[in-house]
Amino acid sequence: MANIDYSFENSIPIGPLKIAALDSCKDFAKKVDDYIVSFRQHDAEALAQRQSMLDFRGYDSKSYLLDFSCPRFGSGEAKCVLKESVRGSDIFAMVDVTNYSLTYQLCGEVNHMSPDNHYQDLKRLIGSCRGARRVNVVMPFCMRAVSISVPEENLLTVHWH
């Protein structure tokens, strides 16, 4: 990736960054995480001056990947289990709903995950991140975007990328 000459002298992070990569997007999320870690290490001078500021807690990290899992039960149902706190964090949930290569067991049979299975796991993750400051979704294929019709006065701050 290209080097970008950018410093954070005039900006403050929203909250500690966490990348929540669902199984369908783990490889890509790892590349994003590696890039952000190296990018932020180059900003060490600005960070050293601000380490005592509360806004910069968690800014310098060896990895921003969130530790969580979405285990499935024998019935095919699943749940999201967070293994670390997300309170006050800026979460970026990454999912590839068109990744058909993932499988799960249902009544002893192997099933491939459909776009809807991936989407349901994403909803489980979002539901478990209630204490986060902000949740952003990085989803290359937004299957329900055209069917959502929300009156303007009811709009929420949800970032779909």
What label would you give each PLM region?
Residues 1-161:
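PRPP-associated nucleotide enzymes
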